[in-house]
C-alpha cells in the first residue's frame, strides 16, 4: 500500500484583508499539513499547485517553506509538486530551486515512482496554449499511475479544461488525477479514473465557508481510497443580518454579539431593508469585541429612485477587483500589466519602467500573450475562484539569488503545530482503470 497526502492551493504569502496575522495563518496551515505527514506514516506529500499566492514571495514566506520542506526531507518524505497559475514565472520557478536544493521534486512528463505508484505532473497552462499540448508521458512499469494537475477541470463546477480529452489523448492509463486550483474539495469517477480536488488549506475568500483541509489517498492493488482530512484554522464568523424597515446599526451590533468573535475573521452580510448602516462602524465594533478583522457585505436592494439604499463594501476588495478583471476577458499581457500596476511590491516610481520592460519582453518572447482571452459568462465569472495569471517576465537569476539567500538563512526548526485530522467520508473507489490523462511541464 502507498499512502500520500494530496494538498494544494496553500497560497503562502497571502496577506488577506491586509492583515499580517492572516499571512501567518496561511503558513501555519501548510505547517500543519507537514506535521500531519510526519505523524501519519505517509509515503509522500503531493502538492497540486499554488504553493504561493503570487510570483514574488517575500523572504519570511520562503524561509517558512524551506523550514517545512527540510522537516519532510529529514523524515525521508518526498515533496512532489507542480506549478500553479498564481506562482508561475516566465523564468525559473521557485519549485525548480527547491528541487536543486534537494527538498522537492517537480513532476512532469517523466515519472517519479513512490512505492510502486508512478506520479506525473501537469503545470497550469493558459487556455490559449492548451491546443499545443499532446499529453504524452514516459510510460513506466508501475502498479499505479497518477497525474497531478492544476486547473479547472471537468466534471466539476466552472470547468474550462476537459478531463476526458486529456485522458483520451494520453499514452498513460491513470488510476487517479489529483487536482488543484478549485478551492472546493470534490471527487468524481470518470471511466474508472478517480478525479479529485483537495481544496485549499486556508480560506482564501469569504465564500469558502466549509472547513479547510486536504486529501489522504491510499493506493492498493485493488482500489484507490480517497479520504478527507480537516485542518484546524483560524475561525471565521459568518454573521447574516436580515434588517426590517426600522432597524439599523443597533440590530447589527446585537446580532454580531451572538457570535464568538475572539481572534476570528468576521464577515457580516446585510440583507432585507432597514436604515443606512456604515460598514466602518460595524467593522470597528467587531474588532472592539475581539475580532481579528471584520468586513461587511451589504446586499440590500436598490431603492425606487435607482440609488443604492445603503453604503456598500466588499468582504475582500482585492478579490472583487480580480473578479471584475476576469470578467473583462483581457489578454495574458494585459493581465500581467494590471498585476504590475496594482502590485504593492512595485514602488509607484518604478511602475512605468516595470510595465515597459514586461511589454517589451512579451513582444519579443510571446506575441500570443496580446491575444484577448475568451470572455466568460457573467455567471461563470461570478463563481469562479481562480484567475489565469499571465506569465511573469521576472529575471530567473534574481529568483535564484533570492531563493538561495533564503536557503542559507533558513534554520531547521521543529515547529510545534498540530491539526485536527477528522476523517470525513471516503470515496468508494473502484479498482478498474480504462482511460487516462496526460501532462505538460
Swiss-Prot record:
Binding of Mn(2+) 1, residues: 9, 11, 50, 183
Regulation: Nuclease activity is regulated by Rad50.
Deleted gene: phenotype: Mutants are more resistant to DNA damage, but recover more slowly than the wild-type.
Alphabetically ordered keywords of this record: DNA damage, DNA repair, Endonuclease, Exonuclease, Hydrolase, Manganese, Metal-binding, Nuclease
Active site: 86 (proton donor)
Cofactor binding mode and count: Binds 2 manganese ions per subunit.
Record family assignment: Belongs to the MRE11/RAD32 family.
Protein name: DNA double-strand break repair protein Mre11
